[in-house]
Design a protein with these regions (language model features):
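Phosphate-binding glycine-rich loops of NTP-binding sites
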Residues: 1-7, 186-192, 233
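Conserved P-loop NTP-binding catalytic core
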Residues: 1-36
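Electropositive, glycine-dotted interaction segments
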Residues: 21, 29-151
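Short acidic, glycine-rich loop/turn motifs
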Residues: 22-28, 49, 165-170, 253
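Short, mixed charged/polar active-site loops
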Residues: 30-32, 171-174, 258
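A short, sequence-level motif marking secondary-structure junctions
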Residues: 36-42, 59-62, 176-182, 264-268
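C-terminal lobe/lid and adjacent interdomain/linker elements of RecA-like ASCE P-loop ATPase modules
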Residues: 143, 217-292
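Conserved ABC ATPase signature
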Residues: 158-194, 201, 207-213
């Protein structure tokens, strides 16, 4: 579980907690998971289930139901602690933990990731595992070649990776190291997406560093088709034309902190038919975005 990344510019201010709150629904049930922590440890943590607080942690003290206990590891989440001791998969604790632990995080710029489906597997092995599905997806892309990724053992019992390129009736086999960076990035992100369960969450930092603008549009369509929620950052204004106004947030960085403004709050009457990209580039939203 990666609730957030520490803002390293504020490491000296160790006593000021950073907080995250996640609202989500599973079937007809609503959950709110909250976490506040400093670099020294978790300060407070809670889980609300259908408006009732069923778990609350303050420092090392954890209250759950009618019992209280202590958690000695300062950075160990109470939700994980309780889920590890429960065998009832339908309990609110296990349902919440399963949902949150299946959130996949990808930094497309550095190719770093945190995804449950990739535990104990290399990214190459997961790409091979999802290769047939990736090829099926690429058939729907007009701007990307069709290929598969396969693995084989050489005479020294070392795993080698290859790329099968399809062009009409022709098949070409090349070492995967020959693949363009765009192909590698596309395969990597698609394999993570295809590994997520339905209603999963995918968080991508700087999506345009891994995907061509046209491929991003195809990727968003696939996310919608698979019923996955995607949270991503981007500097590419072209993407604004594909998103609903209430799903767009603008980030403004100042003095080491970022603030966020929802587009539909800035401009309540805006609709998808408006040219949001043009409005943004013409500085229509600047005053509201940069305001305190």
């Amino acid at each position: 579980m990666l609730p957030f990344v520490f803002n390293m510019s504020n490491v000296d201010n160790q006593n000021k907690p950073a907080s995250v709150r996640v609202h989500f629904k599973l079937s007809t049930d609503s959950f709110i998971y909250s976490l506040s922590t400093t670099i020294q440890g978790i300060v407070e943590e809670s889980l609300r289930f259908n408006k009732e607080t069923i778990m609350h942690r303050k420092g090392a003290t954890l209250a759950y139901g009618t019992s209280k206990t202590r958690i000695t590891a300062p950075l160990f989440p109470a939700l994980r602690f309780l889920a590890s001791g429960s065998i009832d998969e339908k309990s609110p604790i296990n349902r919440a933990f399963s949902f949150l632990s299946n959130i996949a995080y990808v930094n497309a710029n550095t190719h770093s990731y945190l995804a449950k489906s990739f535990q104990n597997k290399s990214s190459y092995d997961v790409m091979v595992e999802k290769s047939h599905q990736i090829r099926s997806v690429l058939k729907e892309y007009n701007s990307f070649p069709e290929y598969e990724i396969v693995a084989d053992m050489d005479k020294n019992n070392k795993k080698q990776y290859f790329m099968k390129m399809y062009s009409g009736d022709h098949l070409f086999v090349l070492p995967f190291s020959f693949a363009s960076q765009g192909m590698k990035d596309q395969s990597f992100i698609l394999s993570i997406l295809l590994s997520l369960p339905e209603n999963g969450v995918l968080v991508i930092d700087e999506i345009e560093t891994a995907l061509h603008p046209l491929s991003i549009m195809n990727f968003i369509d696939l996310v919608v088709k698979k019923n996955i929620q995607m949270v991503f950052t981007s500097h590419n204004t072209y993407i604004l034309s594909r998103l609903r106004p209430d799903n767009v947030f603008f980030a403004y960085w100042k003095d080491g902190f970022s603030t966020y403004r929802r587009l539909s709050d800035i401009y309540p009457n805006i609709r998808e038919v408006n040219n949001i990209e043009k409005m943004y580039l013409s500085s229509t939203f600047d005053e509201a975005i940069e305001g305190d």
